[in-house]
Design a protein with these regions (language model features):
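Catalytic core of the metallo-beta-lactamase
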Residues: 76, 84, 88-122, 127, ...
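Helix-adjacent hinge/juxtasegments
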Residues: 48, 52-95
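Binuclear metal-dependent phosphoesterase catalytic core
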Residues: 19, 76, 102-105, 128-165
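Active-site neighborhood of phospho(di)ester-bond hydrolases with catalytic His/Asp-centered motifs
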Residues: 6-8, 31-37, 54-59, 81-84, ...
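Active-site environment of divalent metal-dependent phosphoester hydrolases
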Residues: 11-15, 38-43, 60-65, 88-93, ...
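Short acidic, glycine/proline-enriched helix-loop-strand junctions
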Residues: 47-56, 120-134
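Beta-strand-turn-beta hairpins that frame and shape the catalytic cleft
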Residues: 1-4, 72-81, 121-127, 149-158
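N-terminal active-site segment of His-dependent metallophosphoesterases
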Residues: 1-51, 61, 66-69, 140-143, ...
């Protein structure tokens, strides 16, 4: 079993990152994904945790050219495809990113950009956008996600900021 913390669009609000990391300290997270906006936030996360933190750059990360635009991350018998998602039209985003990720062998597709939580299962592929813990655009008060992968199946927990304060 693998547990994957999924956060993005933190935009420099390190206090929200601290809140998330403190709240999940005893939840056996195996890795963290930060899909852009801001790259420095992902580097900060790495100083606060002993597990790998994978990051990609977003549309507000122009000053962070070292972060890749996309990553393919091994996950047991499959892969995670991660990108910020701002270069794909909103109405076609899920289908296009799933298509790209599947072509690379990924069954978990993660992106950000919209600041709105979304999960969708397309066949055996899971698409997750954990929203934004810092600047939500959906009235949620802020969200992040924890994805569990066990015996070839995914489970997603949407965690609301008000539940960890």
């Amino acid at each position: 079993m693998k547990r994957i913390g999924n956060i993005r669009d933190t935009h420099g609000y390190l206090d929200t990152i601290d809140l998330v990391l403190d709240a999940t300290m005893d939840q056996n997270i195996d890795m963290w994904l930060h899909a852009g906006d801001y790259g420095d936030d992902a580097r900060y996360m790495q100083t606060r945790t002993d597990v790998p933190v994978y990051a990609v750059r977003g549309n507000n990360d122009r000053v962070h050219p070292l972060e890749p635009k996309e990553q393919l991350i091994p996950l047991e018998d499959t892969y995670i495809y991660m990108t910020h998602g701002h270069e794909v039209s909103y109405d076609k985003r899920i289908q296009e990113l799933v298509h790209v990720g599947n072509a690379m062998g990924a069954r978990l597709i993660v992106c950000g950009h919209s600041h709105v939580y979304k999960k969708e299962l397309l066949g055996d592929t899971l698409f997750v956008n954990p929203g934004s813990i810092a600047l939500p655009r959906d009235g949620s008060g802020g969200t992040f996600a924890i994805v569990t992968y066990e015996d070839g199946a995914f489970d997603v927990e949407c965690v609301y900021k008000q539940d960890i304060i």
